[in-house]
Every structure is written in C-alpha cells, then in structure tokens.
C-alpha cells in the first residue's frame, strides 16, 4: 500500500481571513491529489505581548520536517522574529521541499502577489478618478514584506502626482480593527482627509465603524479603502473597495509548486481591484439588500470579537 504524501502547513493568527483562505486552497488541492495536510497554527494576534507570542508560537516547533514530503509556510503571518528565524532554519536543514507564501525566502519556492502594484492602483484610482488630494494611510506592520510594499506604493503614488504627505497623515497599525478605529481618532485631531487608505480590510472596517460613530458618511464625507477582499468587505454597509488577493489560488499553487518541481521558483498571482461603495463606485443597492447586509455584518462582527476575546 502506497503511503499518502504529507504536507506541513504553518501559519500564525489563523483567525485572520487571509490565512484561512490560503489554507482552504491548500486543503482543496491536497484533497484532489489524495494528500494529507497537517496544520500547525495558533490564534495569536499581532498585538499580543511578548510572553504570549513566545507561548503561542511554540506550536511551530512541533513538526519534524523530515517526516513530511513538503512544507508550506506563511512567514508573514508569524509576527515574532525569533520564531520565524528558528522555523526557517529548521525547514532548510531538513532539505524537504518548501514553499513560502507571499514573502520570498532563499532556498524555497515562492507564491505571492505584487502588493506594491495592487496598493498603488487603489491610490491612483482615488487621485485620478475621484480627483482627491488629501489621502491618509493606515499602515500594516512595516517589518513584513506586504506591509512595507503597500506603504511604499502609497508614498510613491502620492509623490508621483505631486501631492505632499505629512507625518500626521500616517497611522502605524497592526492589521486589526482597533488599529482602524484609533487611526480615525488620530486623524480627527487634524483636518479630516478626503480618503483613508488602509493596508488591509480589518483596519478599513474599524475605520468605517469609528467614522460612522462620529457622524461621518462614507463615501460622501470620507472615502475608505481596504486590501484583501475579506468576506465581510462585501457585506459591510457601505461595501468596501478592496483588492482580491485570490488567496485560495495562492494555496492551490503552493501545493502544485511542491510536487511539480517547476523551474520557476517564484510564481506571482494576479490580483483584482474591486471598486465598491466605500469609494463612491457601484452605489445603488436596494434598501432590503442593505438591511440584509447590515444584519450579516453585525453577526460577523460579534463572532470576530468573540474569537479575539
């Protein structure tokens, strides 16, 4: 009897929609190929204390990689440098084929997207289509590739259009909804911008929540955009302009790279910018649809808060 091939999948903050969707793609493709997937992850958030991160990320010390036929690692999601460094060293030492999702790692296959061009498309859309100039930005974690590239894209788009950016137009967040809420509180101390561009959907939704609580209309008073195309982005009121990273396809391609042994060690997946109501595009939903979306949105927010706490 032939033994089924085994894949180790490693990621942090699995409660985030991005990691879940990539894992979904991995599981679907592995099932099609009659392979087993062993998942090593935790529910740690990016803003956890050092002590909590040390404990939570011990989970990624468990797998003996020599026992697997391939490894898929979401390095960007493990926001604790000692754990990341130890993990990468152990994977390389094992000599087992490995794929890094999103961030390139020497000696591994890589599947990812262009965070830079995807984020730049949104900023340029606001400048060129909506004729905006005062555009603020809510960063992700700049130590990671995706946070750094998205921030650089915002700065470059503004500079190329001759639009200056002040320090008080930037808020340094950590990908959760609370970062979006706090960003709005900071921006309210100054003149409110025409638009707030966020490095992910969770922060964008947090920003929209706080704006609405303070009487701002979206997009009439302030435009908001996100990144990731999380499930809630489509159903929030107003629906969120965002970038579809096609995470499930990333996961499927990660499995393919492990076993097809392609000469191209770096595979880039095309993203899709989705223009919705939060930037003023594609308005006019029927009122009953809005009511249903609001009900769904509230249920999702309650569920996500329960996961966090």
Predicted regions span which residues?
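Alpha-helix capping/helix-boundary segments
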Residues: 78, 143, 150, 202-204
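Intrinsically disordered, low-complexity acidic/proline-/asparagine-rich linker or regulatory tail/stalk regions
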Residues: 65, 283-309
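Alpha-helical recognition/docking segments in bacterial nutrient-uptake
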Residues: 1-124, 187-188, 202, 309
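Hydrophobic alpha-helical segments within soluble ligand-binding/sensing domains
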Residues: 88-89, 106-137, 149-159, 176-185, ...
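Short beta-strand elements in bilobed, periplasmic/extracellular small-molecule ligand-binding domains
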Residues: 30-49, 134-137, 155-178
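Short beta-strand/turn micro-motifs composed of small residues
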Residues: 11, 41, 73-75, 100-102, ...
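Conserved acidic residues
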Residues: 69-70, 133, 194-195
């Amino acid at each position: 009897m032939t033994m089924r091939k085994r894949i180790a999948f490693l990621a942090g903050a699995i409660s985030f929609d991005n990691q879940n969707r990539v894992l979904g793609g991995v599981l679907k493709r592995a099932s099609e190929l009659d392979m087993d997937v062993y998942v090593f992850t935790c529910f740690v958030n990016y803003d956890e204390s050092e002590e909590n991160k040390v404990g939570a990320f011990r989970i990624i010390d468990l797998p003996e990689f020599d026992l697997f036929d391939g490894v898929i690692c979401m390095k960007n999601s493990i926001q604790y440098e000692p754990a990341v460094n130890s993990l990468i060293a152990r994977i390389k030492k094992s000599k087992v084929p490995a794929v890094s999702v999103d961030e390139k790692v020497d000696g591994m296959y890589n599947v990812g997207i262009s965070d830079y061009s995807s984020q730049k498309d949104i900023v340029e859309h606001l400048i060129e289509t909506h004729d905006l100039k005062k555009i603020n930005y809510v960063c992700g974690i700049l130590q990671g590739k995706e946070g750094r590239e998205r921030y650089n894209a915002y700065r470059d788009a503004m500079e190329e259009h001759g639009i200056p950016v002040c320090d008080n137009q930037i808020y340094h967040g950590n990908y959760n909804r609370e970062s979006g809420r706090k960003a709005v509180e900071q921006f309210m101390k100054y003149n409110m911008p025409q638009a707030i561009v966020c490095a992910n959907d969770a922060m964008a939704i947090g920003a929209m929540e706080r704006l609405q609580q303070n009487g701002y209309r979206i997009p009439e008073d302030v435009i908001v955009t996100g990144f990731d195309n999380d499930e809630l982005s489509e159903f929030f009121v107003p629906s969120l302009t965002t970038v579809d990273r096609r995470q499930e396809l990333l996961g499927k391609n990660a499995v393919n790279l492990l076993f097809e042994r392609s000469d191209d060690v770096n595979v880039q997946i095309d993203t899709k910018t989705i223009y919705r109501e939060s930037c003023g595009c594609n308005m006019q939903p029927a009122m009953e649809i809005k009511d249903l979306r609001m009900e769904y949105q509230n249920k999702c927010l309650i569920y996500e808060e329960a996961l966090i706490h």
